[in-house]
UniProtKB/Swiss-Prot annotation:
Family, similarity comment: Belongs to the tubulin family.
Disulfide bonds: none
Major localization listed first in the record, in broad terms: cytoplasm
Protein name: Tubulin beta-5 chain
Subcellular location: Cytoplasm, Cytoskeleton
Pfam families: Tubulin, Tubulin_C
Originating gene: TUBB5
Cofactor requirements of the protein: Mg(2+)
Subunit description: Dimer of alpha and beta chains. A typical microtubule is a hollow water-filled tube with an outer diameter of 25 nm and an inner diameter of 15 nM. Alpha-beta heterodimers associate head-to-tail to form protofilaments running lengthwise along the microtubule wall with the beta-tubulin subunit facing the microtubule plus end conferring a structural polarity. Microtubules usually have 13 protofilaments but different protofilament numbers can be found in some organisms and specialized cells.
Length: 447
């Protein structure tokens, strides 16, 4: 079986992760004690993707929970599905990273990382055919950002040929959780660009907007936001877990979605987003779903896809539907909005269909898009970074942990390069192939 080992790091990662396990367990009919109470063999057919079967028929998640302070772990353990996880897979320190990337990456995190890697090895060894790893974390904190990226680079060394995908919560434009977010996020991107295969970006503000506007929740909590996120994560992995007419796995996704190795930051969307009360009153059709999932209001990341162009995108449908209809809709979207898709990648929309819909819905779609509009996010973070770094504000917290200013400068220029790469491909047309190659050769000669 094609297994995925799931790692959750830091407070944000653990909260998203534990919500994700609630949704996954529910889809597979696993109760909080790990026993199966489902109603269909399909739930068990590929359950190995995320679960290990232990003695007595208990199902245990292939999850590793790590943090530099015990607080979040305790609340996960006390949560509804806390008894599901293997007790040895909780790895935590006592000191906390205090929102300091350097603590997570170089000092506190580096002391804990070996015990995390031991657990990762143990989980990887119990797999038949390990497909890859997924990490949930935030980019603005200390543990998820600093130690999460440290773990990625260590895992990459040890399992170079496995897919590494991350679900990264990026800092929001208006709502800031910590002042040093721009530093932590820029240092994280610096790592993710090199060491991850695909990053699904999420941000709280876009999630709040969805809760307010679409779901009509007046006071959304983090629980509501995480529920949205877990719906999307489950959508990206449904083909691995259930049979379908047209399957899609992490590797296929990476191959189809990443035209250039550095440009692997995706936006995700989910449809149908309806408020909990009005769900059962309307059935959605494939055209409606398609239209909704391409809608910028459904994106879980505060960048507007209309401000850029799609390099590639993938749409995963769930439920019983005709493949012909799906193909027609995909074609329709591209033809109607051709200006939003780069013309030098023909057929850049990939569709996959999984027969089993999520709990409580007849059909749903998950959208993953690699759009140049995501540069808006990086631009915003880079501006905030520069305005603080110019004054060397808060730097002493990082240099005190042994970091060098040079590393900040490198991360900053890497971020700016990323933005200009996105811009370059956004402006590119199919005609200018010749000019492109010359530029590249010049760059190589100069670099």
């Amino acid at each position: 079986m094609r297994e995925i080992v799931h790692v959750q790091a830091g407070q944000c990662g653990n909260q998203i992760g534990s919500k994700f396990w609630e949704v996954i367990s529910d889809e597979h009919g696993i109760d909080p004690t790990g026993s199966y109470h489902g109603d269909s063999d399909l739930q068990l057919e590929r359950i190995n993707c995320y679960f290990n079967e232990a003695t007595g028929g208990r199902y245990v998640p292939r999850a590793i929970l790590m943090d530099l302070e015990p607080g979040t772990m305790d609340s996960v353990r006390a949560g509804p599905f806390g008894q599901l996880f293997r007790p040895d897979n909780f790895v935590f320190g006592q000191t906390g990273a205090g929102n300091n990337w350097a603590k997570g990456h170089y000092t506190e995190g580096a002391e804990l990382i070996d015990s995390v890697l031991d657990v990762v090895r143990k989980e990887a060894e119990s797999c038949d055919a390990l497909q890859g790893f997924q990490l949930t974390h935030s980019m603005g904190g200390g543990t998820g950002a600093g130690m999460g990226t440290l773990l990625i680079s260590k895992v990459r060394e040890e399992y170079p040929d496995r897919v590494m995908s991350t679900y990264s919560v990026i800092p929001s434009p208006k709502v800031s959780d910590t002042v040093v977010e721009p530093y932590n996020a820029t240092l994280s991107v610096h790592q993710l660009v090199e060491n991850a295969d695909q990053c699904f970006t999420l941000d709280n503000e876009a999630l709040y907007d969805i809760c307010f506007r679409t779901l009509k929740l007046t006071t959304p909590t983090y629980g509501d936001l995480n529920h949205l996120v877990s719906a999307a994560i489950c959508g990206t992995t449904c083909s691995l877990r259930f049979p379908g007419q047209l399957n899609c796995d992490l590797r296929k996704l990476a191959v189809n979605m990443v035209p250039f190795p550095r440009l692997h930051f995706f936006m995700i969307g989910f449809a149908p987003l309806t408020s909990r009360g009005s769900q059962q009153y309307r059935a959605l059709t494939v055209p409606e779903l398609t239209q909704q999932c391409f809608d910028s209001k459904n994106m879980m990341c505060a960048a507007d896809p209309r401000h850029g162009r799609y390099l590639t995108c993938a749409v995963m449908f769930r439920g019983r539907m005709s493949t012909k209809e799906v193909d027609e809709q995909m074609l329709n979207v591209v033809n109607k909005n051709s200006s939003y898709f780069v013309e030098w990648i023909p057929n850049n929309v990939k569709a996959s269909i999984c027969d089993i819909p999520p709990k409580g819905l007849k059909m749903s779609t998950t959208f993953v898009g690699n759009t140049t509009a995501i540069q808006e996010v990086w631009k915003r973070v880079a501006e905030q970074f520069t305005s603080m770094f110019r004054r060397k504000a808060f730097l002493h917290w990082y240099t005190g942990e042994g970091m060098d200013e040079m590393e900040f400068t490198e991360a900053e220029s890497n971020m700016n390069d990323l933005v200009s790469e996105y811009q370059q491909y956004q402006d590119a047309t199919a005609e200018e192939e010749g000019e492109f190659d010359e530029d590249e050769e010049l760059d190589d000669a100069m670099g």
